[in-house]
Amino acid sequence: MRGDDRHNGGYCAPPARLPVPALTAILELRKVRKQYGDTVVVNDLDLQVHRGQCFGLLGPNGAGKTTTLRLLLGLTTPAGGSLTLCGEPIPERAPQARMRVGVVPQFDNLDPDFSVIENLRIFGRYFGLSSAVIERRVPALLEFARLENRANAQVRDLSGGMRRRLTVARALINDPDLLIMDEPTTGLDPQARHLIWERLKSLMASGKTILLTTHFMEEAERLCNYLCVIDGGRKIAEGKPHDLIDSQIGCDVVEVYGDELDTLRGSLTPLAERTEMSGETLFCYVREPAPLLAALHGQSGVRYLHRPANLEDVFLKLTGREMRD
């Protein structure tokens, strides 16, 4: 939606809303701690999300991402530290803060007994919006979700990608200061995923602030302009995606597949900054790839892929390659 849609009937701001100052953090956690029994799940966590950012919160399973989201929404109480959301202290004024937030949960919770347009209307009432305001916003949201021609369709008849787009549109019904998205494209095929990315980029272009959790590193690299990686409830790295790639990896990657990789690794190690075995793949990190590629050329029973380093390399370096439950 364009900014002028707020005044031409597409997207009308709630009259009682107080603006969040542009130069302050829209979300801030300071030394936040949460534990269940003896298990610490969020450990002195500091975060700041500023207006206009697409902020990625990354971490393996069990890192504390879901608990962090619950804490910032006031759905669970911290054991220590302080939180503010949209200028409100959390959890003391969590209900007021949540009125200025849109949430896209990991799993769709649309009402299957209602149509697309009815899902939008009902959700608008949860925020106390008048029927007039809701009716002004719905057409723009249907257009945003590319569901103009499915407004009266039942949710049960929509594809997975359509349901996900409707969930995002529904989270925008209150014109939120912050949009929180938990694994927004999990379970979608590539075409549906790319369409969601396109819609999110249009939100970012309009200045919307987004907090995103995802296990798709390509998604984080494409969408986010700032990232925080957590593990064990602690922040272990933060920065812009390409800055993290440069500082943590800083070179090209050659993936090698084939026979007798342990033997081959010995001859390739002197040609690389470092090497790493993971399953049936040898990873070689190289600043000058030509000598290593020359050594691989003509090797029988060996395949290889030379590529730039990416955010997945960073994530695996920081959190390890072991499977997490």
From Swiss-Prot:
Natural source organism: Cupriavidus pinatubonensis (strain JMP 134 / LMG 1197) (Cupriavidus necator (strain JMP 134))
Pfam short name (any one): ABC_tran
Enzyme class: translocase
InterPro entries: AAA+_ATPase, ABC_transporter-like_ATP-bd, ABC_transporter-like_CS, ABC_transporter_ATP-binding, ABC_transptNodI, P-loop_NTPase
Membrane topology according to the record: Peripheral membrane protein
GO cellular component terms, semicolon-separated: plasma membrane
The protein's name in its UniProt record: Nod factor export ATP-binding protein I
SUPFAM superfamilies noted in UniProt: P-loop containing nucleoside triphosphate hydrolases
Domain ABC transporter as annotated: residue spans: 27-257
Family, as annotated: Belongs to the ABC transporter superfamily. Lipooligosaccharide exporter (TC 3.A.1.102) family.
Gene: nodI
Alphabetized GO MF terms: ATP binding; ATP hydrolysis activity; transmembrane transporter activity
Keywords: ATP-binding, Cell inner membrane, Cell membrane, Membrane, Nodulation, Nucleotide-binding, Translocase, Transport
Subunit structure, interactors included: The complex is composed of two ATP-binding proteins (NodI) and two transmembrane proteins (NodJ).
Top-level taxon: Bacteria
Primary location class: membrane
Coiled coil ranges: none
CDD domains for this protein: ABC_subfamily_A
Function: Part of the ABC transporter complex NodIJ involved in the export of the nodulation factors (Nod factors), the bacterial signal molecules that induce symbiosis and subsequent nodulation induction. Nod factors are LCO (lipo-chitin oligosaccharide), a modified beta-1,4-linked N-acetylglucosamine oligosaccharide. This subunit is responsible for energy coupling to the transport system.
Subcellular localization, as worded in the UniProt entry: Cell inner membrane
UniProt-listed Enzyme Commission number(s): 7.6.2.-
Chain sites annotated for binding ATP: 59-66
